Amino acid sequence: MKSCQKMEGKPENESEPKHEEEPKPEEKPEEEEKLEEEAKAKGTFRERLIQSLQEFKEDIHNRHLSNEDMFREVDEIDEIRRVRNKLIVMRWKVNRNHPYPYLM
């Protein structure tokens, strides 16, 4: 009967400390700390992004470009595109004309 009483009562191993106890709040594993830091960073990034968007919406009405300024900006963008396309074509030609392309 003693064996039945032991089974009905507390387990024998309860007097021993558990090795797989959850860590105290002070002693969090490094992985949890990293996750919390990432969550905070994402939260702050999101807040900064929202703030930036609001500032842009407020500021957009104060930005008036004259026709000359608009043409100048468009010309700069076109020049950047032309140079970029030239570089892409030059790189393509160099890679295509290689005698042994698989040795690179």
Swiss-Prot record:
UniProt keyword annotations, A-Z: Nucleus, Transcription, Transcription regulation
Signal sequence region: none
GO cellular component terms listed in the entry, alphabetical order: nucleus
UniProt feature, compositional bias: Basic and acidic residues: 1-27
Chain segments carrying region Disordered: 1-44
Presence of the UniProt keyword Transcription regulation in the record: yes
Family annotation (InterPro entries): TF_A-like/BEX
Subcellular location: Nucleus
Family: Belongs to the TFS-II family. TFA subfamily.
Functional note: May be involved in transcriptional regulation.
Protein name according to UniProt: Transcription elongation factor A protein-like 9
Organism classification: Eukaryota, Metazoa, Chordata, Craniata, Vertebrata
Gene: TCEAL9
